[in-house]
Amino acid sequence: MYNNKTMGSNKTIIINLNNLEHNLNLIKNKIGEKEIVATLKGDAYGHGLINIFKFLKSKNINYFGLSNIEDAKTLKKIDKNIKILMYIKVDKKEIKNLIKFELVPFVSDFEYLFLIEKECALQKNKIKVHLKIDIGMNRYGIKIDDALEIATYIQNSKFLELEGICSHLPSIENFKTTQKQIEQFLFFLETLKQKNIHPKFVHISNSGHIINYKLNPQFNMVRPGLILYGYCQSLKNKKPALNFKPVLSLFSKVIFIKNVKKGEKISYSGIFQAKEDMKIGIIPIGYFDGIPQNISNDFYFLINNKKCKIRGKVCMNLTIVEIPKDLKVKTGSKVEIVSEKLSIDEMSKFSKRSHYELLCNIGKYEKRKYLD
């Protein structure tokens, strides 16, 4: 529970582990027996890699998805038995650590495979890999027309085990496009079966797919990211069916109060001019802290459950809000910036920035308080 004693500085990030467990249970109930890969890239979306990892591990999650090999090494040093999927290629000089720490890379080209095989030979070891197929994202992944050749090569390699086949759905909000891409992927799976290639795991489901679609029984692994942290992308004109709870909250406090006379301008460039005498509060948080500057002048924070509109430009480390006439505020009063009452959905819609970007920017650099 947040209160003024919880906050030891001008800004406090609270991570609610009860809400994380709630979201995890919703996912488990939706997917049944499928294996979960908890996506922890981007410092667990700004929630803190190590603490989120430890909590999810305590809830019997065994697979984790990362993009940074330094993060992978950190987690492997905590628990060498966990399984980590590396979503993107590691640097050439880190391939030895890929093998040493028994990480599971997503592979999509022969050059990368040859480097991995060479290192496996040196270490006299074998590595599991997941073949990443591109079905429309045009990002990391081999084009589906070229995928059979590389799958066959992996199948026949004495240093590689084709543990998984995977892809990524880029346009979850577009049902027809997504269904077509899934059909392409399923057709490729049938081709593999005809060649007697049977990977243990087949996975294509990100957060949006898990929540909005019926999952094909062949997909026995899922990769939730954003929904773990309390947010989900829905199909157009469709409300989310599940009640996810935000895990991250951001609080600050009022550090200065002053009166502004009618006609006076506020903050840089004077983009706000007072239409009447008003009282303003100074909040020690700004765009350095992940608050997008384009919410200047009209978005709001909450003080004592009342909307306090931002006035003037959001500054690097300060934001100015108007204090309503009927609201009693004093120096030290709590300010809610992201919370269960004011979810990041609102800031995302207003700023036209994604939940991903906002969460990562808000959580960057900061110490967090973990509540359970």
From Swiss-Prot:
Cofactor requirements of the protein: pyridoxal 5'-phosphate
Annotated EC: 5.1.1.1
An annotated GO BP: D-alanine biosynthetic process
Catalytic residues in the record: 41 (proton acceptor), 268 (proton acceptor)
Keywords: Isomerase, Pyridoxal phosphate
Binding-site residues, substrate: 139, 316
Protein name in UniProt: Alanine racemase
Record organism: Borreliella burgdorferi (strain ATCC 35210 / DSM 4680 / CIP 102532 / B31) (Borrelia burgdorferi)
Taxonomic lineage: Bacteria, Pseudomonadati, Spirochaetota, Spirochaetia, Spirochaetales
